[in-house]
């Protein structure tokens, strides 16, 4: 079963800590290596996200019907979105030294996803967790605890900025209806 955190998740604001200079450098160095394979890494992240959290596909008319991970990997629309996600993350990571720029970029992302796409903000937390999983796997032998903590701080920073943008636009959590699946869904058929 897929578990998607509910409304309390948004109310519990993540503690967002600034990254130290050493943490910024550690994240940026690892990110540079990941971003060298931007499209493939982005696709791996999104495929895992959609396989593990299929309810997230409801926001993507172009590939919400896809079940097969290989079909997802080959989808030009998914690949294009993966590049957009990686590009936004790249802008954030490259500008970790500039909190105003980070805030501005994440506010734009949050507002677009709230107003235009109507994406529940909890999916940003879920996606950032998937990103951390992929990073940990890619760098299993080179991911010391202090670097893991830096990435966890980055995750909190992203989520807090995005949810702040949702609150700024007056986001109200969507109530499940005929087109929006409930928070808990069976992961397979009957």
Swiss-Prot record:
GO biological process terms, alphabetically, are:
fatty acid oxidation; negative regulation of collagen biosynthetic process; negative regulation of fibroblast migration; negative regulation of hepatic stellate cell activation; nitric oxide catabolic process; nitric oxide metabolic process; oxygen transport; removal of superoxide radicals
> Keyword set for this entry?
Cytoplasm, Disulfide bond, Heme, Iron, Metal-binding, Nucleus, Oxidoreductase
DNA-binding is among the record's keywords: no
Mutating residue 83 to R leads to what result? Decreased nitrite reductase activity
One Pfam annotation reads Globin
Cellular component annotations (GO), alphabetically ordered: cytoplasm; cytosol; neuron projection; neuronal cell body; nuclear speck; nucleus
Tissues expressing this chain? Widely expressed. Highest expression in heart, stomach, bladder and small intestine.
Record-stated family: Belongs to the globin family.
Q: Main EC class of this protein?
A: oxidoreductase
Q: Which PROSITE patterns match?
A: GLOBIN (PS01033)
Per its database record, what is this protein's job? Probable multifunctional globin with a hexacoordinated heme iron required for the catalysis of various reactions depending on redox condition of the cell as well as oxygen availability. Has a nitric oxide dioxygenase (NOD) activity and is most probably involved in cell-mediated and oxygen-dependent nitric oxide consumption. By scavenging this second messenger may regulate several biological processes including endothelium-mediated vasodilation and vascular tone.
Identification of the protein by name: Cytoglobin
Catalyses which reaction(s): Fe(II)-heme b-[protein] + nitric oxide + O2 = Fe(III)-heme b-[protein] + nitrate; Fe(III)-heme b-[protein] + nitric oxide + H2O = Fe(II)-heme b-[protein] + nitrite + 2 H(+); 2 superoxide + 2 H(+) = H2O2 + O2; H2O2 + AH2 = A + 2 H2O
Subunit text: Monomeric. Homodimer; disulfide-linked in vitro. Also homooligomeric in vitro.
Classification via PANTHER family:
CYTOGLOBIN
Q: List the disulfide bonds.
A: 38-83
Post-translational modification as stated in the protein's UniProt record = The formation of an intramolecular disulfide bond between cysteines Cys-38 and Cys-83 specifically enhances the nitrite reductase activity.
Domain Globin, first and last residues per copy = 18-167
According to the UniProt entry, what is the EC number of this protein? 1.14.12.-, 1.7.-.-, 1.11.1.-, 1.15.1.1
UniProt organism field: Homo sapiens
Task: List, in alphabetical order, the Gene Ontology terms for molecular function in this entry.
Answer: carbon monoxide binding; catalase activity; fatty acid peroxidase activity; heme binding; iron ion binding; nitric oxide dioxygenase activity, heme protein as donor; nitrite reductase activity; oxidoreductase activity
User: How is this protein's activity kept under control?
Assistant: The nitric oxide dioxygenase activity is activated by a reducing system composed of cytochrome b5, its upstream reductase CYB5R3 and NADH.
Annotated coiled-coil segments of the chain: none
Q: Where is the protein localized?
A: Cytoplasm; Nucleus
Q: Where does heme b bind?
A: 81, 113
């Amino acid at each position: 079963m897929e578990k998607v955190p509910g409304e309390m998740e948004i109310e519990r604001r993540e503690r967002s800590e600034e990254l130290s200079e050493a943490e910024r450098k550690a994240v940026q160095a690892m990110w540079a290596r990941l971003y060298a394979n931007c499209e493939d890494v982005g696709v791996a992240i999104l495929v895992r996200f959609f396989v593990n959290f299929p309810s997230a596909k409801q926001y993507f008319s172009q590939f919400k019907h896809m079940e097969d991970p290989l079909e997802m990997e080959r989808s030009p629309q998914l690949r294009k979105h993966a590049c957009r996600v990686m590009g936004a993350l790249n802008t954030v990571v490259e500008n970790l030294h500039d909190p105003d720029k980070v805030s501005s970029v994440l506010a734009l992302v949050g507002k677009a996803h709230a107003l235009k796409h109507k994406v529940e903000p909890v999916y940003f937390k879920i996606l950032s967790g998937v990103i951390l999983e992929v990073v940990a796997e890619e760098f299993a032998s080179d991911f010391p605890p202090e670097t893991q903590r830096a990435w966890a701080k980055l995750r909190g920073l992203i989520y807090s900025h995005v949810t702040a943008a949702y609150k700024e636009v007056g986001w109200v959590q969507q109530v499940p209806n005929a087109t929006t699946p409930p928070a808990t869904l069976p992961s397979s058929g009957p």
